[in-house]
């Protein structure tokens, strides 16, 4: 029995800038296919996507990728839906044409070389002079 970690990822309802949210579902014998990712509910009142009295929202998987960090892990990109299945007002993706393959996402990881003698980044001034205006 093989278990997989599916990290459901979506945009919350914060304005002016939405934040990434996620929660993990553990599934047995997952085949890695989008069609095998079930819809999942969450409490929208904690993400500014629903009022406290009726706070259920749905996560609809729309894209899946292997997790580059976790073994047997998958990143499941989701749209947010209302309980009736209609697109939530924070779901800007619902207005995008699904036939357009021009949209991509990626991860960026930054690295620093560290000088063990100064305990500062390599080439960084010892007096830690400000870098100046950008």
Could you tell me what each predicted segment is?
Residues 1-134:
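Glycine-rich, acidic/polar active-site loops that bind/position phosphate-bearing ligands
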């Amino acid at each position: 029995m093989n278990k997989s970690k599916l990290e459901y990822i979506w945009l919350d309802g914060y304005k002016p800038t939405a934040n990434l949210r996620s929660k993990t579902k553990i599934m047995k014998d997952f085949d890695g296919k989008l069609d095998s990712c079930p819809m999942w509910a969450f409490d929208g009142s904690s993400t500014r996507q629903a009022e406290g009295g009726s706070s259920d929202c749905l996560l609809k998987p729309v894209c899946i990728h292997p997790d580059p960090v976790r073994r047997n892990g998958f990143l499941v990109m989701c749209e947010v839906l209302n309980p009736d299945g209609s697109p939530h007002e924070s779901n800007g993706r619902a207005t995008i044409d699904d036939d357009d393959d021009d949209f991509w996402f990626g991860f960026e990881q930054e690295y620093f070389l560290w000088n063990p003698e100064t305990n500062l980044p390599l080439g960084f001034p010892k007096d830690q002079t400000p870098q100046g205006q950008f």
